[in-house]
Amino acid sequence: RYHHNLETSENYFAKVVTTHTYQDRIKTIKAAKRAGLEVCSGGIIGLGETLDDRIQMALALKELDVDSVPVNILVPMEGTPFEDRAALSQSEAIKTIALFRIILKSKTIKIAAGRESILKDFQALAFMAGANGMLIGGYLTIKGREVDEDLKLVEEVKMLWQK
């Protein structure tokens, strides 16, 4: 499996990444697919992009036919270019996951970085909205929850689905 996030929409990409182009990322994903690799590609929401940017990212991921889609939620951190961004609301995060599920019907959608600090006790709602996977442990810039806590969340979600 090859992991290579688009990060955001083509329209917003240059505001986030300056070392390479959006088309470079597209070419890399296509090359990985041609090589027969499963591709995990998603992005970060809450960078300052619009809802339309998020929809455009999901549509691009659909067109690329990636296998799984991690949805990271920005946690503004001091000392980073995005430290002054307002944290994305829980409702915006859940709405985005629901839109991704509508667009990416059969794909694995994983809630990832930011889920603990942004969604807090409402992480189960992400699964009700359409997520069907999650990344656990630590992330690039923030610590995740303990595995035992995530296993409890999985059990809670199972109970919700059984009702």
Q: Where do the model's predicted regions map?
A:
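Conserved non-cysteine loop/helix-boundary elements of the Radical SAM core domain that shape
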Residues: 1-36, 44-65, 80-92
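Conserved hydrophobic beta-strand within the GNAT/NAT acetyltransferase core sheet
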Residues: 4, 41, 109-113
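Auxiliary Fe-S-binding modules of radical SAM enzymes
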Residues: 34, 59-163
